[in-house]
Amino acid sequence: MPEQPIAVAMSGGVDSSVVAAMLVREGRTVVGMTMQLWNQRRLPELAVEGATTGRCCSLDDVYDARRVAEQVGIPYYVVNFEEQFEEHVVKPFVDEYLAGRTPIPCTLCNNYIKFDRFLEMADSVGAYHMATGHYARIRHDEATGRYQLLRAVDDSKDQTYFLFGLTQAQLARTLFPLGELNKPEVRDMARSMDLAVAAKGDSQEICFVPNGDYAAFMSAYLKEKGVAVEETSGEIVTTDGRTLGRHEGVHRFTVGQRKGLGVATGEPLYVISTNPANHQVVVGGNDDLLRGGFTAKDVNWISIAGVEPGAPVRAQVKIRNRHAAAPARLVATSDRDRVEVVFDEAQRAVTPGQGAVFYAGDLVLGGGWIE
């Protein structure tokens, strides 16, 4: 009986290209696929010269992925997920900002597109496993029967923060071949295999937001939809209620932001919170950003079954990707999908809409969304 192929999600970058080449060298049957997610032509006022699609799925990226597939001798397909991407990633991204929260589109994309719709496409080519260029590790715990998610060996490239929504069913079918490698090793492998993308740089920004200007993207997107963004100036106020100035929309601000406030008091000011209902942006000093804890909602447990009432779990908690995980207690609530996070020491800029990911060493216990 022929071996089932492995479907590799190829972005046209170095990491996924090395994954495809590694698997071929191991003698595995591989099929390459690139996901078409967003067409930049829809919003011409934001178009970047020479680009017709989002940064992670531009025509250049498709061309690069196809070249690598031809190099390593595997079938290659482009699959169009633009409709699903807009529904599950772009629209929630816009809605969250308008609601005064700061979203993580990469996590939504992982949950609903890369590890959901893509697996459906893997089924269509007879593949059980999919492989990606993510820096993370998976192992199966024989004692509990659970698939566990672990940090990558290269902590500087670790992407587990964006993977906290993966289910047991998704983890069972996923391979992360780069989890035991560091980025320089991957670059060296790309060069040694003479891959066409060996010298290609890494993408940094949100793939569908040109130049990282999310406020401009939102305005253009809502204009296309015929929705008027509430641009009426609101107040910028201090934590004690003093009005310092006005702004052009709460969706332009996020907790912890310092630049672009347009007001000054002689002391550094930061966004403490936003209130879309009354169009207020609340600002204050650095100490006003400190929080002793928060509630995480829609919690997805990965490496453990959950937190039991009366039995808090110790963990290190990350509240954004570049945050150094902080020691905390996870306390059960009456709702299993919610957890109270109590830090040992107050943390700065706990931001509604961001992810909270719970770690025990390298092990990802689970994660949820900051309320």
Swiss-Prot record:
GO terms for molecular function: ATP binding; tRNA binding; tRNA-uridine 2-sulfurtransferase activity. Keywords: ATP-binding, Cytoplasm, Disulfide bond, Nucleotide-binding, RNA-binding, Transferase, tRNA processing, tRNA-binding. Its EC number is 2.8.1.13. ATP binds at A9, M10, S11, G12, G13, V14, D15, S16, M35, G133. It catalyses: S-sulfanyl-L-cysteinyl-[protein] + uridine(34) in tRNA + AH2 + ATP = 2-thiouridine(34) in tRNA + L-cysteinyl-[protein] + A + AMP + diphosphate + H(+). InterPro entries: MnmA-like (IPR004506), MnmA-like_C (IPR046885), MnmA-like_central (IPR046884), MnmA-like_central_sf (IPR023382), Rossmann-like_a/b/a_fold (IPR014729). It is an enzyme of class 2 (transferase). This is tRNA-specific 2-thiouridylase MnmA. It comes from Solibacter usitatus (strain Ellin6076).
